[in-house]
Design a protein with these regions (language model features):
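Alpha-helical scaffold segments that flank or form the walls of functional sites
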Residues: 17-26, 34-89, 110-129
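Catalytic pocket-lining loop regions of alpha/beta-barrel enzymes
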Residues: 155, 159-242, 248-249
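Active-site gating/metal-coordination segments in enzymes
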Residues: 81-84, 89-161, 216, 222-226
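Divalent metal-coordination and catalytic microenvironments
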Residues: 22, 64, 158, 217, ...
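Mid-to-C-terminal alpha-helical segments outside catalytic/metal-binding sites
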Residues: 2-9, 274-315
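Histidine/acidic-residue-rich catalytic or RNA/ligand-binding cores of hydrolases
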Residues: 29-33, 76, 175-181, 203-211, ...
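Short acidic/histidine-rich active-site segments
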Residues: 67, 166, 220-221, 245-269, ...
Length: 315
């Protein structure tokens, strides 16, 4: 089997196992960390994330994909330390979030691609840790002129390296379709793209529009019940399985062991089950109760992630 760039070194795709495809060790505002050295307690972040990952591993999770992009505070030294201490397989990302930052304006697409390329080919932040996936993002504003540029960066970086793309979307604004349009214009094979946050809707017909174009969809915000309750997320997956789409879905939480957007108290109040343990503990039993077979669960948690990373080679 081919290898994928892992945080602790190459991972044989045959050994990926149960994979959470969209998670975060830490989201921490880079400018605030630079301005205030005590903005985060790094040791506490690493310790908490290590505990969370070990708990997930005890429940059968073998690999976690950390999709934190550069401008959400990706810190590869934190990710690496957590992987080493937890003893788990992790895959890190390169790429950008959707926020339209002023400095993007003056950079051409190919110049940004050149800047990101070493993250995949050499190492991130002066380390030997190479990115194994490319993050792209489009939110409620849709594919603006600047967002198109960022999607083009992801597309060209993907085509230059063969590393897969995984996205953030606002599914209620149908931004996944807009992402697919830009990727297709750039010559991207849409079957090598994961369109994320599709689990935030019950609109099966809309999701089928994305699926029919070949992409995998991320049913990847389990635990964010205030956005859509678990039961509705589960029933949507069950409906798509019955319609024959099981080979194009992956599962995850989009959980953050540390996020500086909210207080810990607010996270506990709004999303008490938002952790790497929620899918093994609660979601998989609910899927089975809704008629999803163990074979289909394995397809979504093991086989589909493996296929995402097996499709390799520049083109």
């Amino acid at each position: 089997m081919p290898n994928v760039n892992g945080v602790l070194g190459p991972i044989d795709t045959a050994d990926l196992g149960f994979t959470l495809m969209h998670e975060h060790v830490m989201v921490a505002t880079p400018a605030m960390r630079q301005a205030f050295p005590d903005w985060i307690d790094r040791d506490a972040v690493v310790a908490n994330a290590t505990t969370e990952l070990r708990a997930a591993m005890e429940r059968g999770v073998r690999t976690m994909v950390d999709l934190t992009p550069i401008n959400l505070g990706r810190d590869i030294t934190v990710i690496r330390d957590v992987a080493e201490r937890a003893g788990t397989q992790m895959i890190a990302a390169t790429g950008f979030y959707w926020t339209e930052e002023p400095w993007f304006q003056g950079w051409e697409v190919d110049r940004l691609v050149e800047r990101l390329l070493p993250d995949i080919t050499t190492g991130i932040q002066g380390t030997r840790v190479r990115a194994g996936i490319i993050k792209a993002a489009t939110d409620h504003l849709g594919v603006t002129e600047l967002n198109r540029k960022l999607l083009q960066v992801a597309a060209r970086l993907h085509r230059a390296t063969g590393v897969p793309i995984s996205t953030h979307t606002s599914v209620h604004h149908h931004t996944g379709l807009g992402q697919q349009d830009v990727f297709a214009e750039e010559g991207v094979d849409l079957s090598r793209v994961v369109i994320g946050h599709c689990g935030d809707t019950e609109d099966v017909e809309h999701l089928e529009q994305i699926l029919k174009r070949g992409s995998t969809i991320g049913m990847d915000r389990f635990g964010l019940d205030f956005m859509l309750p678990m039961e509705k997320r589960v029933s949507t997956i069950a409906a798509l399985c019955k319609r024959g789409w099981v080979k194009q879905m992956v599962l995850s939480h989009d959980a953050c062991c540390h996020i500086d957007w909210f207080s810990k108290e607010m996270v506990k109040q709004l999303a008490p089950r938002w952790s790497f343990r929620h899918i093994p503990d609660d979601v998989l039993p609910a899927l089975r109760a809704d008629g999803v077979s163990d074979a289909d669960i394995r397809t979504m948690t093991v086989d589909n992630p493996r296929r995402v990373f097996e499709r390799q080679g520049a083109y």
